[in-house]
């Protein structure tokens, strides 16, 4: 199982399009959109030097937006030497203004700021060729480019931006004042793709799936003849990370699965059956449900529950690791710890430069200092949807690859109130019904996540049969999202909701009311606790 059979032969790591982050909330989204155009991309901070950029051997540069004014003291600066590299460059919002200023254009504060949906008028050029002459875009600016640099054609304007887009085909330079990366700009992806493929001349030949072989070889080179462990949660990230490492080093990987008793119905069996069957990985299961329940007894504060669950998880994982280290079969010890860190975590921690310490958002990130491992993070350059693509390339079961996000503390934070064995059983049965009906209705790929919440400290009066009931409410929380930073509530057909409600109130005796949460994020978080 240590070979990479079935995968494409590994190729060199792809040259990236570098997204220079000027403090934009959308920098990661820009990188995602570039990858959706089938070109590999990475985010780097605006403090990255020209020498560092050159060393990365990029295919092109995208300058992100940002909250500052180019005239504000201390505002992020753009090194003019960037334009001496001969690389294609595309500026967005603040990056567009910084680009204009450095190249000799004029940036000024106009009388009209633009925030939100704005009408863009196309004046010519190639960026918007074939697109509507007047189209909606998403703007967020106070300053504006009032004169394009010499040699640039003005491609579009708006009421608050005399120069809302410019381009220079000969130098492969272009930019826009609006945000092409957001869904509120309907033709934005076409504009970005046109720059990448037509202006920059880049091939659309990158996908997450076709780098699975590369990732396997990178892991094999990093671990060599060593042994590794991986904390397996049953989620997509840890499962794909473990599968990659197992493909690279075979039975020198041991996965540890801590069953804290807060899982949904059937999840333990899924991990033990489907994951092991698909990968052949060695799996150690730790039964810790009773320990977790004892620690959570009497606790109702959400943050308190999270801390207790995290602390107990670390202790259970640590105990399993110590048992392994005491096993004589590990003569050389265990040197490596596999984690399912994803690219958003790398960027948010300041790791985009490749030099900063990377935070760990996974449960095993809190291991004591005296248990020192070298980190293996095979997914650290991928987004969630790309991780799923790699998982499919590795032939992981669809039940694992397409699994909806599930919080580390599990059902413990989907019970509003104290966590008890009885309440877990009630929630587990209600959750199982909801998931079953959503799957039957074919909604698994339309709903990003659907938390089912038990309001354990709330009761309401009802009538079940000829008797008065006094049961708990269950909350359904279907949402759609790309990265969990924002989320919209998702419409579910009424007949599906009716079926879920009827089954839960009929089959789960402790529940007599089912309600629907239709709150977006913000203001509401996806999870209730």
UniProtKB/Swiss-Prot annotation:
Pfam families to which the protein is assigned, alphabetical: GATase (PF00117), GMP_synt_C (PF00958), NAD_synthase (PF02540)
All residue ranges annotated as the GMPS ATP-PPase domain in the record: 206-403
Record has Nucleotide-binding as a keyword: yes
EC number(s) from the headed UniProt entry: 6.3.5.2
Encoding gene (name): guaA
Stated name of the protein: GMP synthase [glutamine-hydrolyzing]
InterPro entries assigned: Class_I_gatase-like, GATASE, GMP_synth_C, GMP_synth_GATase, GMP_synthase, GMPS_ATP_PPase_dom, NAD/GMP_synthase, Rossmann-like_a/b/a_fold
GO molecular function, one term: GMP synthase activity
S-S bonds: none
Pathway this chain belongs to: Purine metabolism; GMP biosynthesis; GMP from XMP (L-Gln route): step 1/1
GO cellular component terms listed in the entry, alphabetical order: cytosol
Origin species: Mycobacterium leprae (strain TN)
Role noted for this protein: Catalyzes the synthesis of GMP from XMP.
Residues the entry annotates as binding ATP: 233-239
Active-site residues annotated for this sequence: 93, 179, 181
Enzyme class, UniProt record, top EC level: ligase
């Amino acid at each position: 199982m240590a070979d990479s059979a079935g995968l494409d032969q590994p190729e060199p790591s792809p040259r990236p399009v570098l997204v220079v982050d000027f403090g934009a909330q959308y920098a990661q989204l820009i990188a995602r959109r570039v990858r959706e155009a089938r070109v590999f991309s990475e985010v780097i901070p605006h403090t990255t030097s020209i020498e560092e950029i050159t060393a990365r051997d990029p295919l092109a540069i995208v300058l992100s937006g940002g909250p500052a004014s180019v005239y504000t003291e201390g505002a992020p600066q753009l090194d003019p030497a960037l334009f001496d590299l001969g690389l294609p460059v595309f500026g967005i919002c603040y990056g567009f203004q910084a680009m204009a200023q450095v190249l000799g254009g004029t940036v000024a504060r106009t009388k009209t700021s633009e925030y939100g949906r704005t009408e863009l008028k196309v004046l010519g050029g190639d960026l918007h060729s074939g697109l509507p002459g007047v189209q909606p875009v998403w703007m967020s600016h106070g300053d504006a480019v009032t004169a394009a640099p010499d040699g640039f054609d003005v491609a579009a304007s708006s009421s608050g931006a005399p120069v809302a887009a410019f381009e220079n085909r000969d130098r492969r330079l272009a930019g826009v004042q609006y945000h092409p990366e957001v869904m509120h700009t309907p033709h934005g992806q076409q504009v970005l793709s046109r720059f990448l493929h037509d202006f920059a001349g880049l091939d659309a030949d990158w996908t997450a799936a076709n780098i699975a072989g590369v990732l396997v070889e990178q892991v094999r080179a990093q671990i060599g003849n060593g042994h590794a462990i991986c904390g397996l949660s049953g989620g997509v990230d840890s499962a794909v990370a473990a599968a990659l490492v197992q493909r690279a080093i075979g039975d020198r990987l041991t996965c540890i699965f801590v069953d804290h008793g807060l899982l949904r119905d059937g999840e333990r069996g899924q991990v033990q059956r489907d994951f092991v069957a698909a990968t052949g990985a060695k799996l150690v299961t730790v039964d810790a449900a009773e320990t977790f329940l004892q620690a959570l007894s009497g606790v109702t504060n959400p943050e308190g529950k999270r801390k207790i669950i995290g602390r107990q998880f670390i202790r259970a994982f640590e105990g399993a690791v110590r048992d392994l280290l005491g096993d004589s079969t590990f003569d050389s010890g265990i040197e490596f710890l596999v984690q399912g860190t994803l690219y958003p975590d790398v960027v948010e921690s300041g790791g985009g430069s490749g030099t900063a310490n990377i935070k760990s958002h996974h449960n095993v990130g809190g291991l004591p200092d005296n248990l020192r491992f070298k980190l293996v993070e095979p997914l650290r350059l991928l987004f969630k949807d790309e991780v799923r693509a790699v998982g499919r390339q590795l032939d992981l079961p669809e039940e694992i690859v397409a699994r909806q996000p599930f919080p580390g503390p599990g059902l413990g934070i989907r019970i509003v109130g104290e966590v008890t064995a009885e309440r877990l059983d009630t929630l587990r049965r209600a959750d199982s019904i909801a998931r079953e009906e959503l799957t039957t209705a074919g909604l698994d790929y339309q709903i990003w996540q659907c938390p089912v919440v038990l309001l354990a400290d709330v009761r309401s009066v009802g009538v079940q049969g000829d008797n008065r009931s006094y049961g708990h409410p269950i909350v359904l929380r279907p949402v759609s999202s790309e990265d969990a930073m924002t989320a919209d509530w998702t419409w579910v057909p009424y007949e599906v909701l009716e079926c879920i409600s009827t089954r839960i109130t009929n089959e789960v005796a402790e529940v007599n009311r089912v309600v629907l949460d239709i709150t977006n994020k913000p203001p509401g978080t996806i999870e209730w606790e």
